[in-house]
Amino acid sequence: MDAVELLMNVTPNETRIALVETGMLREVHIERQAKRGIVGNIYKGRVTRVLPGMQSAFVDIGLEKAAFLHAADIVSHTECVDENEQKQFKVKSISELVREGQDIVVQVVKEPLGTKGARLTTDITLPSRHLVFMPENSHVGVSQRIESEEERARLKALVEPFCDELGGFIIRTATEGASEEELRQDAEFLKRLWRKVLERKSKYPTKSKIYGEPALPQRILRDFIGTNLEKIRIDSKLCFGEVKEFTDEFMPELSDKLVLYSGNQPIFDVYGVENAIQTALDKRVNLKSGGYLIIEQTEAMTTIDINTGAFVGHRNLEETIFNTNIEATKAIAHELQLRNLGGIIIIDFIDMQTDEHRNRVLQSLCDALSKDRMKTNVNGFTQLGLVEMTRKRTRESLEHVLCDECPTCHGRGRVKTVETVCYEIMREIIRVYHLFSSEQFVVYASPAVSEYLINEESHGLLPEVEMFIGKRVKVKTEQFYNQEQFDVVVM
């Protein structure tokens, strides 16, 4: 297993964490304080109102608005033990379940929105990378997405010994293929966490938060239990102290791997992470052989196109295509992980003439994807020669986190040519001429469009329009207009 380092860069209101494996950036995680929610937090609340007609109750958990608890969300784990199993049971009357003035431990499942308070459940769960802990329950549930009966039985047999009076577990989809040691570390971590929640429950007053969904550094460490973490470098004394306190209490095996970075250069610059992040926002990915990938992210899917680059001649073309496709499989696996691309992914490899080459490329892709922490599924080549695959989506892609829609092209990825905009201006002048009586028109446009209209490049477009309408047209440059932006003003 390759050595892994985590680099944590902390600035006011933003934390960035890079996973570097053998010197190469593999993953980037970003959290901004303004976007942190309360889903997953556990509160010691008090029922303030019971509404039998709505089968719900309002609970004061110490926030500005009272939170909402529906009768269907007051359930026990024994009624639903599989991660994806639908709850099927008869819901009791809310009046039988809670009463006004009752203290109750609840977990937030939906953020407050507008005038509505947060939505709650009494069905407390604590997640880690492989397991979900279910307090006060001895069952072991297995995600239905793990389809192999043999694997389901293996995992269940490994996890059952970890169940005790504290609770049981749900085995998550990502657990497929996990080792006994990975599962043991996950289970021990979750039980230590629950003991802390119980301790706070008895000590803290009503309307208090007794567990908060961890900040990004703690979540990342939680999810990397069992991996070959070599060093965890942190460039903030405050964050270092918080992480050290967390690892000392819940993950003592990681405490001696923490390093406080105090260099003069930013930590992401020293390790080449900053440049790698910028490169990961480009559509084009260059391959060492001279070929390249074009990665296009859309609402429906992600498409990846592979090209050979320079033409090498007919005699070696088939071998060049095959080698380029093999190289591309490794680059694709890396880019999917780095950019955090999920959902449907369509790959257009360069056309190959033999089934042997196609099968070897497909196997190379599967081998490269096997190192991904996210679940992937490769469906093979379609009749059109495209490879269909899926990758589990758990968070926004790097592009969606860091970028916004272009205000000029509105997400098209293209802007109209200067010539096209000039003809639009001419049509607008003629339209306005028929609507209003005017002696003169003034066109305000971007520098490139203004220059095209004024100079001879436009092949006399402006004089022709002036002759057509019998009016004078002036052109003025607006430095801050984008290429498609213009105004036609009547004088």
UniProtKB/Swiss-Prot annotation:
Purpose of the protein: An endonuclease that acts in the processing of the 5'-end of 16S rRNA and 23S rRNA. It prefers 5'-monophosphorylated substrates and cleaves single-stranded sites rich in A and U residues; contributes to tRNA processing and mRNA turnover.
What are the annotated GO cellular component locations?
cytoplasm
Name of this chain's protein: Ribonuclease G
The organism's superkingdom is given as Bacteria
| UniProt keyword list | Cell cycle, Cell division, Cytoplasm, Endonuclease, Hydrolase, Magnesium, Metal-binding, Nuclease, RNA-binding, rRNA processing, rRNA-binding, tRNA processing, tRNA-binding
Q: Which residues form the S1 motif domain?
A: 40-129
Pfam families linked to this entry: RNase_E_G (PF10150), RNase_E_G_Thio (PF20833), S1 (PF00575)
User: Could you say which residues form the signal peptide?
Assistant: none
Q: Which organism is it from?
A: Haemophilus influenzae (strain ATCC 51907 / DSM 11121 / KW20 / Rd)
| Cited Gene3D superfamilies | Nucleic acid-binding proteins (2.40.50.140), Ribonuclease E, catalytic domain (3.40.1260.20)
